[in-house]
Amino acid sequence: MDKVNFPYRSDSHLPFLHVVHDSGSWEKHGLDVNYDYEISSEDSHKNVANGTVEFVGGNHLSPYIRRPAGDKWVYLGQTVSLLNHRLVVRADSGINKVSDLKGKKVATKGKHPGLNTWLFIKQAGLLNECHVEKAKGSKFHWEAVRDGEADAAFVTPPADILSKRAGLKVIEVPFLPMVWFTTVSSGLPFVEKHAEIVDRMLRGICEGIAYFKTHRAESIKIIKEKYKAEGDLDDETATHLYEDLKKILQGKPYATIPAIANVYEISIEQDRAAEKTDPMALWDFHYLRRIDDSGFIDNLYRT
C-alpha cells in the first residue's frame, strides 16, 4: 500500500472525498490516501514542488498565474465542470430573477467562489450594475443576506436548504461551466517519475465517482456521518447534497472546454500574469485517456 497526500483547497470537496475513501476506492488500487486536511494555495505550490505533497484537490487559479515564472503545476483529472449554484434572497426583497440584482449588494466568500459570482454576474450583463462584496467575519455568506448585510448570495447545496429554513427565498439559476471542486492536481516532475501512482490515483477517483453514482443509500450515509463543515446534516440536507452532486459528477473526469475557458477568465481577473499562460497548458489528460481507452471506466457501470 503506497501512502500519498491529497489535501483539499476547500472543505466543500469533502462530501465526495469521504465517499471515495470510505468506499475503499483508493484502497482497491493500493493507495492509502491522506485526504482529510486543507492546504493553502501557497503551500500547495511549495509542498508539491518539494515532494512532501503528491497531489492537491483543486488549486484552480494560481497555477495559471505562476506558470510564466516556471511553475510546473499540472491538472490530471476534473470531477465536475458545472457550478451547481442557486441565488438566495430575503423573501421581501422583490428579487425574483438574476436581472433584479441591478443596484443590489451580492455577498460572496473566498477568492475563487467570489470570482465565480463575479463571472456569472458579468455574463448576465450586470457587472457595473450591482456591488459584489465578500461577507465579513466567519459567517456563511447566505447568513449576511439573512442578517440584512447583503441583498443576495449565490450558494451551493446544502446551503440552499439551510437558507430556505432561515426564511430566505431560493431562486433557481443556470449552472455555470467552471473548473472547481475536486481536481486531481500535481507537479510535472512527480507525475513523470511516478506514472504508475498517477494511474492508480485516477483509477481510484473514477472508481469513487462510480460508487457515488451507483450506491445512493451508502453514499448518503457516509455524507451524513462525516461531512460537518456546514453543521450536522439531517436526512433532507444530506440527500439533497448527494442528489445534486450526483448530477454534476462526471463519470469520465475530463474538464469541459467551457469550464476551462471560464476558470481561465477568472484567473486573469485575479492576476493579469495569467494572460501569458495558454488556457490548455496546464491540462494533461493522457493518463486518464489511457484508463478510459482500456474500458476500465465503462466497466464500472456495467451491471
For each predicted feature, which ranges?
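Short, glycine-/small- and polar/acidic-enriched structural segments
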Residues: 1-133, 138, 151-155, 170-178
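Predominant activation on well-ordered alpha-helical scaffold segments within soluble catalytic domains
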Residues: 18, 64, 118, 161-164, ...
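Pocket-lining segment of extracytoplasmic ligand-binding domains
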Residues: 61, 140-229
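Small-molecule pocket liners
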Residues: 81-87, 179-184, 188-189, 263
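Secondary-structure end/capping motifs
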Residues: 194-275
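Conserved C-terminal helix/tail region of periplasmic/extracytoplasmic solute-binding proteins
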Residues: 264, 268-303
